[in-house]
């Protein structure tokens, strides 16, 4: 099943990416949306969008939930982002059938935390503070709907002490077309139990 799921994700990548481009042009969907003052949730950032994101959105870092093959043709890899002065974290997760595992979700939240102002930092996370790094983090997968939304939901829960329902409701207000399936909901609930509920 894992092999066939990974193969299906690969085969469907370009057609579904084209669908996302068309939906952004033909509907009210945005390529990306700001979730709070520090986190942007979006689709695959094309190389042509990089400078705009840096200049207009004060983007300092990128978290990609994509696998390597999804980044090759249109988006920057670690080296290309670093040349632009952007920190990059890749938490590769297979599209459609998988949710990011708990270790990846925690690493992602910890990474985002590095770019928050000191007074807004999530307590208990081991991330160094450098004032020059304060800015926005662009969190993405292919469409900015499922894998990346799962990570952003975890960030919102830890930052605000929210439940999974509260985090998802907030994301839907900002980005109505997010799409979470049972596996993503299960991941959010487990993350909440392990990292939020036990600390409140």
From Swiss-Prot:
The keyword Glycosyltransferase does not apply. Its main location: mitochondrion. Keywords: Hydrolase, Lipid biosynthesis, Lipid metabolism, Membrane, Mitochondrion, Mitochondrion inner membrane, Phospholipid biosynthesis, Phospholipid metabolism, Protein phosphatase, Transit peptide. SUPFAM superfamilies: (Phosphotyrosine protein) phosphatases II. GO terms for biological process: cardiolipin biosynthetic process. GO terms for molecular function: phosphatidylglycerophosphatase activity; phosphatidylinositol-4,5-bisphosphate 5-phosphatase activity; protein serine/threonine phosphatase activity; protein tyrosine phosphatase activity. PANTHER family: PHOSPHATIDYLGLYCEROPHOSPHATASE AND PROTEIN-TYROSINE PHOSPHATASE 1. This is Phosphatidylglycerophosphatase and protein-tyrosine phosphatase 1. It comes from Drosophila melanogaster.
